[in-house]
Amino acid sequence: MKGSRTITATPEGSPEAVDLSLIGLPPPMSQRPGSASATRSIFRSMSVATGSEPRKKALEATGPGGPRAINNLRRSNSTTQVNQSWTGSPRPAEPTDFLMLFEGSTSGRRRVASLSKASSEKEATWNVLDEQPRGLALPASAQSPSTLDSALGPRRKECPLAPSFTANNRSNKGAVGNCVTTMVHNHYASSKMVSPPKSSNQTAPSLNNIVKAAAREGGEGSDLGKPRKNLSSASQSARGTTGLLRRREVTEEEAERFIHQVNQAAVTIQRWYRCQVQRRRAGAAALEHLLASKREGQRQRLGGGNLLELHRQEEAARKKAREEKARQARQAAIQVLQQKRAQKASEAEHRRPKDRPETRAPEQPRPMQEPGCVTHPKANNAGASIYPTGPADPCPPASESSPEQWQSPEDKPQDIHSQGEARQDLAVSGSSRGKARARATLDDLLDTLKLLEEEPEPLPHPKAYHKDRYAWTDEEEDANSLTADNLEKFGKLSAAPGPPDDGTLLSEAKLQSIMTFLDEMEKSGQERPAPWRESLVLEAGSGSEGSTSVMRLKLELEEKKQAMALLQRALAQQRDLTVRRVKETEKELTRQLRQQKEQYEATIQRHLSFIDQLIEDKKVLSEKCEAVVAELKHGDQRCRERVAQMQEQHELEIKKLKELMSATEKIRREKWINEKTKKIKEITVRGLEPEIQKLIAKHKQEVRRLRGLHEAELQQREEQAAQRHLRQAEELRQHLDREREVLGQQERERAQQRFEQHLEQEQRALEQQRRRLYNEVAEEKERLGQQAARQRAELEELRQQLEESSAALTRALRAEFERSREEQERRHQMELKALKDQLEAERQAWVASCAKKEEAWLLTRERELKEEIRKGRDQEIELVIHRLEADMTLAKEESERAAESRVKRVRDKYETELSELEQSERKLQERCSELKGRLGEAEGEKERLQSLVRQKEKELEDLRAVNTQMCSERASLAQVVRQEFAEQLAASQEETQRVKVELAELQARQQVELDEVHRRVKTALARKEAAVNSLRKQHEAAVKRADHLEELLEQHKGSSLSSK
């Protein structure tokens, strides 16, 4: 920090030569006191303020002009000569960089404010060396800008130093260095101190003392209460020496070194301050970024948390009530503690001996120190102290650090500083140490309780948990019922208990800090001497209260643990019950599924007999529907074309009607113009200009009215034509829709009738087949019973014959069946191919894709159904065979059971195969006949549809003929109308030409008449102007005459009055 210095050169004989500032650079060699010029006085500018309140003692002690600096200077300045007179002229200006340091931070503002208050309370300045108050009155011109801006700022004074110096005064240099470093470190603990350059007359011990003092003060960290350790030694050395200040000399190099040290200290302070400001800004920016990210995350998390909003509101209300109760309890505890403290203080004051000596050397008892807390006694820089220094102050107990857990980082240095100042006051005033220590202990306890009583600062972004560990104490009434919501809630609490929220009840950290503080107070009270034993009663009371709260919290914790265990057991029971219910439900659902499966299988078996017929009918109906849809689309397309033609014709008609209306309107307009021109001629004959103007306005108004009427009428005609056209188109569309609906309804009815007839036939055939099978089975049973006796005798013969005949017959039947099946398949494939070719030729492109998809699905479904039917038929046949075998075995019984059963199985096998072949042949024949019948029906339907198409085409031709006839008639009518309009148009054009000629003549005549009227008006105006001028002249003459008469009257009056 390099500033400007102010040098005032005075004559040689003057003792005031140079004015050096703390913030300036050392003067050059040509202007120093050791040069050829006369001796000059060196002024040192300091800001000193005093106050009388105990609150400001610490600030005065740490300032550059406080008692500590004074003691250090008094101890070592035995030969300093301070005999210069007070000049009363301070520096004219000083940069505000050094004051900005104190105004930039909160602690600096507090110090400046306290100094301002002190200076306002007691207006006095102190000399640095002799401590005598002197009045200080700074002129307005000598005040700096900082003092002008802030009326409450600290005042400055000038202390002249002695002009003569000695060469070997080493203790003074050490004392000055100690004063500067103490002044700097009492306010700011810097970690770097640059030593000044050595001079020729500087010895190593003094420089080492300065460096050691700076290093020791920097090593003590942020504990700002430690620099007061040298106070007792300084005060004792000052008492040991003579009370009067001795004359001593300060060398030029020591003054330069002092200025350099102050400059270096100011630079270090500003660097430290800027570093702290930058660090604070970076931390604030990082915190803001973190808060923004947390806020965004919380907003995203809380976006879907509306389901538990009501529950959270209830929890917040309960939490608020609980906090209010805790706050009231803490306030009551604080009030009780304050009462006890006041009572104990009064009792201690009464019991303290009144004749206690106050001037004895302060001896501090050694309280119990914490392990790891080391004291650093300060070195004696001057080496002139003859009395032993007292022990350094102990480290602050845990009670001083426990409230810092709830303090902000900005308040901690100020609190530590205030505690250090309090300890310094205890060291200085030994007589009131016991009372002050007890009060400090009680103040710390009161501050701790106040911090606990204060409302906690809400976190900027709460974590994922929003409930504290004790939040469910108020919910015991709601949580007694084992509902699903309560079980889920208690399960979440037991599974992942979140950390407690700050401020609801006493957290574990707060409780631990309070207990540590109480333990430390008990230990320090046990080793404290008798005069301070009485102040421990309040601590014991607070310890009992703390232990009571701990026991209460432990009991609550045990209760909550028991409740949690009970809820966990209930939750396990509920889970077992849920598992059992799930298993029972699964069994019930499995049973229902099995029943439904059986019902569905029975339903499928009932409906399988009708699926083949329905599939075929669906194919036929789909083909017919496709044909009908194609026909309807074709008809719809033709109708759209017809509508488009009719729209074009209507547009032509509307256009012709517009032309006709325009021609008619033109003719009518011409007639109206002729009539109006005649009327105008009659009016212009009269030669009245106002009437002409009125007629022209009326004519324009009439033209506008007629134009509006014409436009309205034309628009109305267009709307009527458009409505008529739309009405005709709507009628045609409705007619087509009705026809299409009628045709579709008829087709649907016929298809429904055919389907019902076919269904009835199939049902009758199925019933007949069922009865026939039952009859055949009964006859077969009877025949087998009759033949049983004969077969017993002829068993051996028939066995071989039956085997041979059955083998031959089987081969013959199988060959015949194969040939017949191949022939039937071939014929069937040919017929199907012919039908498919015919149908594919008639379909459209878009119908083909849909039909292919449908056909593929139907074919797959047909194969599946056929397979299922074949399986079911095989099962039925097997059941019949088993029943027949059982009957045969019962009839044969004993001796021939094996042979009869073998013959029976062979015979039944061949008979069943034969019956199957016969049934399949009959089915194929029936299917072939059915297909032939359907083909005939399809051909008949095709013929009917073709006839219907021919009928529709004939009707269409008739309609076209009628349309052409109407068009021809319309064209002839339009031609006649067009010819008439042409004749009328020619006549109207001739009339228009004639009217135009007459109008031109009328306009020329009107112009002449207007000119005549204009000339007459001009002459009338000229006559009027002449008359007005003559009248004006007469008026002026009359005015002059009246003025003359008034003057004469005045003269006459004056003469009459003078004569009287």
UniProtKB/Swiss-Prot annotation:
<feature type="compositionally biased region" description="Polar residues">
    <location>
        <begin position="32"/>
        <end position="50"/>
    </location>
</feature>
<dbReference type="GO" id="GO:0007283">
    <property type="term" value="P:spermatogenesis"/>
</dbReference>
<feature type="compositionally biased region" description="Polar residues">
    <location>
        <begin position="73"/>
        <end position="88"/>
    </location>
</feature>
<feature type="region of interest" description="Disordered">
    <location>
        <begin position="136"/>
        <end position="155"/>
    </location>
</feature>
<feature type="modified residue" description="Phosphoserine; by MAPKAPK2 and PLK4">
    <location>
        <position position="78"/>
    </location>
</feature>
<comment type="subunit">
    <text>Self-associates. Associates with the centriolar satellite BBSome protein complex Interacts with BBS4; the interaction limits BBS4 availability for association with the BBSome complex, and hence negatively regulates ciliary localization of the BBSome complex. Interacts with MIB1. Interacts with PCM1; the interaction increases in response to ultraviolet light (UV) radiation. Associates with microtubule; association to microtubule is reduced in response to cellular stress, such as UV stimulation, in a process that requires p38 MAP kinase signaling.</text>
</comment>
<keyword id="KW-0221">Differentiation</keyword>
<dbReference type="GO" id="GO:0035735">
    <property type="term" value="P:intraciliary transport involved in cilium assembly"/>
</dbReference>
<feature type="modified residue" description="Phosphoserine">
    <location>
        <position position="14"/>
    </location>
</feature>
<feature type="modified residue" description="Phosphothreonine">
    <location>
        <position position="473"/>
    </location>
</feature>
<dbReference type="GO" id="GO:0001669">
    <property type="term" value="C:acrosomal vesicle"/>
</dbReference>
<feature type="compositionally biased region" description="Basic and acidic residues">
    <location>
        <begin position="314"/>
        <end position="327"/>
    </location>
</feature>
<comment type="function">
    <text>Component of centriolar satellites contributing to the building of a complex and dynamic network required to regulate cilia/flagellum formation. In proliferating cells, MIB1-mediated ubiquitination induces its sequestration within centriolar satellites, precluding untimely cilia formation initiation. In contrast, during normal and ultraviolet or heat shock cellular stress-induced ciliogenesis, its non-ubiquitinated form is rapidly displaced from centriolar satellites and recruited to centrosome/basal bodies in a microtubule- and p38 MAPK-dependent manner.</text>
</comment>
<dbReference type="GO" id="GO:0071539">
    <property type="term" value="P:protein localization to centrosome"/>
</dbReference>
<dbReference type="GO" id="GO:0007288">
    <property type="term" value="P:sperm axoneme assembly"/>
</dbReference>
<dbReference type="GO" id="GO:0002177">
    <property type="term" value="C:manchette"/>
</dbReference>
<keyword id="KW-0966">Cell projection</keyword>
<feature type="compositionally biased region" description="Polar residues">
    <location>
        <begin position="1"/>
        <end position="11"/>
    </location>
</feature>
<keyword id="KW-0970">Cilium biogenesis/degradation</keyword>
<feature type="domain" description="IQ">
    <location>
        <begin position="263"/>
        <end position="283"/>
    </location>
</feature>
<keyword id="KW-0217">Developmental protein</keyword>
<feature type="modified residue" description="Phosphoserine">
    <location>
        <position position="105"/>
    </location>
</feature>
<keyword id="KW-0744">Spermatogenesis</keyword>
<dbReference type="GO" id="GO:0036064">
    <property type="term" value="C:ciliary basal body"/>
</dbReference>
<feature type="compositionally biased region" description="Basic and acidic residues">
    <location>
        <begin position="409"/>
        <end position="424"/>
    </location>
</feature>
<dbReference type="GO" id="GO:0034451">
    <property type="term" value="C:centriolar satellite"/>
</dbReference>
<feature type="modified residue" description="Phosphoserine">
    <location>
        <position position="150"/>
    </location>
</feature>
<dbReference type="GO" id="GO:0042073">
    <property type="term" value="P:intraciliary transport"/>
</dbReference>
<feature type="modified residue" description="Phosphoserine">
    <location>
        <position position="481"/>
    </location>
</feature>
<feature type="modified residue" description="Phosphoserine; by MAPKAPK2">
    <location>
        <position position="47"/>
    </location>
</feature>
<keyword id="KW-0832">Ubl conjugation</keyword>
<dbReference type="GO" id="GO:0010824">
    <property type="term" value="P:regulation of centrosome duplication"/>
</dbReference>
<feature type="region of interest" description="Disordered">
    <location>
        <begin position="217"/>
        <end position="248"/>
    </location>
</feature>
<feature type="modified residue" description="Phosphoserine">
    <location>
        <position position="114"/>
    </location>
</feature>
<dbReference type="GO" id="GO:0090316">
    <property type="term" value="P:positive regulation of intracellular protein transport"/>
</dbReference>
<dbReference type="GO" id="GO:0005814">
    <property type="term" value="C:centriole"/>
</dbReference>
<keyword id="KW-0131">Cell cycle</keyword>
<feature type="modified residue" description="Phosphoserine">
    <location>
        <position position="146"/>
    </location>
</feature>
<feature type="modified residue" description="Phosphoserine">
    <location>
        <position position="89"/>
    </location>
</feature>
<feature type="compositionally biased region" description="Basic and acidic residues">
    <location>
        <begin position="217"/>
        <end position="226"/>
    </location>
</feature>
<feature type="modified residue" description="Phosphoserine">
    <location>
        <position position="35"/>
    </location>
</feature>
<dbReference type="GO" id="GO:0007286">
    <property type="term" value="P:spermatid development"/>
</dbReference>
